Amino acid sequence: MINSPRVCIQVQSVYIEAQSSPDDERYVFAYTVTIRNLGRAPVQLLGRYWLITNGHGRETEVQGEGVVGVQPRIAPGEEYQYTSGAVIETPLGTMQGHYEMIDENGDAFTIDIPVFRLAVPTLIH
């Protein structure tokens, strides 16, 4: 979890065995992000950047507008939650990134999302 003066980000990931195919080096993960506005004014998420790294160190960058097709506006004390997915070639990997946001005055700020793990559960003891 990371906190800024205005926003708290929490991420949980889960392995999707039914959509994965280890024999084909295809490991599917879902991740759920909760964005909480801890400030006294609304904020809006405009864009995202992800760096996805597989277990061999191969990096993939993903960036774009909004998340899951929307640019949510989050009122003070409220939260926005969404689930998305990532596919990597190894049973273990990581994701990290940032969100580009604006406050009620239109001032831009960036919220870093620290590294979190994508892992097949049987690998972690």
From Swiss-Prot:
One GO term of the biological process aspect: error-free translesion synthesis
Every ApaG domain range: 1-125
HAMAP family in alphabetical order: ApaG
Biological function: Not known; mutations in apaG/corD give a phenotype of low-level Co(2+) resistance. They also decrease Mg(2+) efflux but not influx via the CorA Mg(2+) transport system.
Protein name: Protein ApaG
Biological classification of the source: Bacteria, Pseudomonadati, Pseudomonadota, Gammaproteobacteria, Enterobacterales
